[in-house]
Amino acid sequence: MAIQTDSFAAAPAPSSGSTRRLISAAPTSPNEEAMERALRPKLLQEYVGQAKAREQLEIFIGAARKRSEALDHVLLFGPPGLGKTTLSHIIAAELGVNLRQTSGPVLEKPKDLAAILTNLEANDVLFIDEIHRLSPVVEEILYPALEDYQIDIMIGEGPAARSIKLDLQPFTLVGATTRAGMLTNPLRDRFGIVARLEFYTPEELVRIVTRSAGLLNVPIDAEGALELACRSRGTPRIANRLLRRVRDYAEVKSDGRIVKRIAELALTMLDVDPRGFDVMDRKLLEAVIHRFDGGPVGLDNVAAAIGEDAGTIEDVIEPYLIQQGFLQRTPRGRIATLAAYRHLGVTPPRGGAGPVGSDLFEG
């Protein structure tokens, strides 16, 4: 099986400081992406978590392989860092076919996509990351390719221009997105297999951390792995990043073995608290509680209070706090919940705080 990544396969990463947070779910550097590839499971039996999606893919891939057909088109969606790219590689490996990888933002013209499609071999997998960012003109050429394995291309210019149909080899499109709601209905309807990836449990992350530690030749015990897992925000990418940073700490400050105490000391030094919150998370919660009496407060006021861009707060910092039940968005503004007061050790006002949020990692 060959894996080909186009030279234009990745859009430039934003340069905002918030994207370089240690607990960011997005890749922070090319070096990290290379490390992810080294740690990536190769087959479904090695893949941890996402039990429902994994079971469905096992069945659909097995059936396609049995019939020697292309797998139906697959849409993978969910928060960043949960394994969408990894699953695309696994799908190709399980099918025993080639993988061609690119991304939505860099397919600027129909000819960019046409060049890729016409070079696919029978039953190959085409992986398009950030597929919600495809331009409308590129998306239009994709429809007949997905349905009929054909594309229409224009030959010539001006009055002499004409359209011809080109037949394609049967192929499987695997699209990945963090924003399924931004997909157009015609594109979404062309995926026969749709899988939502969920946050991982601490138990699943312990297995991932333990496996990665083994591949990196890092000695780690069960309690050390659990400490990392609980601070990883339900995200394997973050778990593997924390593992590498704690490994550095253990090698310099101890005997190189990661145990609970070493993990606690390292992560405290790195400003990652027991809930996986960092300085920016706590700064936002403290601003809402101390400067605005727990809210409601508007986004622009919060942004001014903590010196951060409003878009970064809304897209990068807030989602996990809201998902974990520490912050609420209401029509009147942001409100800190009782869970936020308790986490910061602040006595909530009588009847003034939002409800206690549900906890992904309880139980």
Swiss-Prot record:
Superkingdom of origin organism: Bacteria
Binding site for DNA: 329, 334
Molecular function terms, GO-annotated: ATP binding; ATP hydrolysis activity; four-way junction DNA binding; four-way junction helicase activity
Residues bound to Mg(2+): 85
Any Gene Ontology CC annotation: cytoplasm
Catalytic EC class: hydrolase
Residues that hold ATP according to the record: 39-40, 81, 84-86, 147-149, 190, 200, 237
UniProt region (Disordered), positions on chain: 1-32
Chain residue ranges for the region called Large ATPase domain (RuvB-L): 13-200
Coiled coil: none
Reaction catalyzed: ATP + H2O = ADP + phosphate + H(+)
Record region (Head domain (RuvB-H)): 274-363
Biased composition (Low complexity): 7-18
Similarity field: Belongs to the RuvB family.
The protein's assembly and partners: Homohexamer. Forms an RuvA(8)-RuvB(12)-Holliday junction (HJ) complex. HJ DNA is sandwiched between 2 RuvA tetramers; dsDNA enters through RuvA and exits via RuvB. An RuvB hexamer assembles on each DNA strand where it exits the tetramer. Each RuvB hexamer is contacted by two RuvA subunits (via domain III) on 2 adjacent RuvB subunits; this complex drives branch migration. In the full resolvosome a probable DNA-RuvA(4)-RuvB(12)-RuvC(2) complex forms which resolves the HJ.
PANTHER family: HOLLIDAY JUNCTION BRANCH MIGRATION COMPLEX SUBUNIT RUVB, PTHR42848
Its job: The RuvA-RuvB-RuvC complex processes Holliday junction (HJ) DNA during genetic recombination and DNA repair, while the RuvA-RuvB complex plays an important role in the rescue of blocked DNA replication forks via replication fork reversal (RFR). RuvA specifically binds to HJ cruciform DNA, conferring on it an open structure. The RuvB hexamer acts as an ATP-dependent pump, pulling dsDNA into and through the RuvAB complex. RuvB forms 2 homohexamers on either side of HJ DNA bound by 1 or 2 RuvA tetramers; 4 subunits per hexamer contact DNA at a time.
Protein name: Holliday junction branch migration complex subunit RuvB
Organism: Leptothrix cholodnii (strain ATCC 51168 / LMG 8142 / SP-6)
